[in-house]
Regions:
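Catalytic cores of nucleic-acid endonucleases
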Residues: 84, 281-330
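Conserved beta-strand segments of alpha/beta enzyme cores
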Residues: 254, 331-333
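Nuclease-adjacent, charged terminal/linker segments that flank catalytic cores
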Residues: 2-221, 227
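Active-site beta-strand-loop-beta-strand hairpin of nuclease catalytic cores
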Residues: 15-19, 55, 267-277
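Generic recognition of long tandem-repeat/solenoid scaffolds
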Residues: 209-213, 246, 266-268
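C-terminal structural cap/anchor segments
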Residues: 259-265, 278
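C-terminal helix of von Willebrand factor
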Residues: 333-349
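Acidic-basic catalytic patches of nuclease active cores, encompassing PD-(D/E)XK
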Residues: 190, 218-260
């Protein structure tokens, strides 16, 4: 289900996307601003500033920030410092969107991921939907989607041999090979010294630092690394899904990842034929997650029960838990990983 965004929220998403791109440039050893370029700043950041400038002049009769550089500096102080109206979208408006000068905050990353996932933003077709369209266009088996996504999730730094092996084992992937290449970029020569996580491909000192099994440093030089959208939109969200699939499969149950072109994250089939549908969710903003889930649903894949499942470590944060519970109004039950496993065990008795 496509999430509905207000114009104000789209502005904030563009801002966050632009800030993330600037931080990524810095972390890759590139200039944050391309001084001699026609467009020195990331396009989403430029668009956010342009639209905010109109808003400020109409509302305040003056510019709140005279330049993009000033706006970026404000983002290092707090969300409220950038624009007070943005406070409604975040859990902690008095905290910065850029931490330690060069790292996007967890909430900033969370909103930035929507730029690549949402069709509503400037008709920007999401990578995942383009993959689905290509699979339908070439009449490929639906399992192609699962194979493709799993490869990316498990291979943040694939070698040429890894990709050749994938194509040899699954020749149907050849039809969507260009999209596979699009998920990666050439790694900088200093990739092994950049503080990249070998699990997700993101930066070690980043918003993924609390993700289970993440933040293990990359120790060898690599040829390819995932683009930042791949990290946020494909790899990190898949960590909980792959983790759950492994545990449930070891319990002797049939588990299907991303069934029927991602109608759910997990389809669990019990020995008696009963089916549960799981949509696994991680978040950087409890406010944003609640708003998303209030609009979300899990389509029919033959299930008798549906659950939204979140990582255990998220629910250990009582403040996040309180924020989420106060804002979630949906009908689908939201439970933790460990609670899901507990219920599966009970169902098997």
């Amino acid at each position: 289900m496509t999430e509905k965004h207000t114009e104000e929220e789209i502005l904030f998403i563009k801002l966050c996307k632009g800030l993330v791109e600037i931080c990524d440039r810095i972390n890759r050893g590139e200039p944050a601003y391309l001084v001699n370029d026609y467009q020195p700043f990331p396009q989403p950041l430029y668009e956010a500033f342009e639209q905010l400038s109109i808003k400020w002049i109409l509302r305040d009769e003056k510019m709140r920030h005279p330049s993009i550089l000033n706006m970026v500096e404000a983002a290092r102080h707090s969300v409220e410092a950038v624009e007070p109206d943005f406070c409604q979208w975040v859990d902690f408006p008095d905290e910065p969107l850029i931490e330690d000068m060069i790292q996007p905050s967890e909430e900033c990353e969370d909103f930035a991921s929507d730029y690549s996932l949402s069709l509503e933003i400037d008709n920007n077709q999401s990578y995942i939907l383009r993959l689905m369209d290509e699979i339908k266009k070439y009449d490929l088996p639906l399992q192609t989607y699962t194979i493709f996504r799993r490869f990316i999730a498990e291979n943040p730094f694939p070698s040429e041999f890894d990709q050749a092996l994938l194509l040899d084992k699954h020749p149907e992937i050849e039809r969507v090979k260009d999209l596979l290449e699009e998920a990666y970029q050439p790694a900088p020569p200093q990739s092994h010294d950049m503080g990249l996580c070998k699990k997700c491909g993101g930066y070690l000192d980043c918003a993924a630092r609390e993700i289970n099994e993440c933040c293990e440093p990359l120790e060898q030089k690599v040829d390819k690394s995932p683009i930042i959208d791949t990290v946020y939109c494909l790899i990190r969200p898949s960590l909980i899904e792959l983790r759950l699939a492994k545990i449930i499969k070891e319990m002797g149950l049939e588990v299907e990842l991303w069934p029927e072109l991602d109608k759910a994250d997990l389809k669990i089939t019990f020995p008696d034929g009963k089916i549960w549908a799981i949509d696994a969710k991680d978040w950087g903003s409890a406010t944003r997650l609640a708003r998303k889930l209030n609009q979300d649903k899990i389509p029919d894949i033959g299930q008798s029960q549906s659950f939204f499942v979140v990582p255990d470590y998220r629910l250990k944060k009582l403040q996040d838990q309180a924020i989420f519970k106060s804002k979630y109004q949906g009908n689908i039950e939201v439970i933790s990983e460990s609670e899901l496993i507990k219920r599966i065990k009970k169902e098997l008795k």
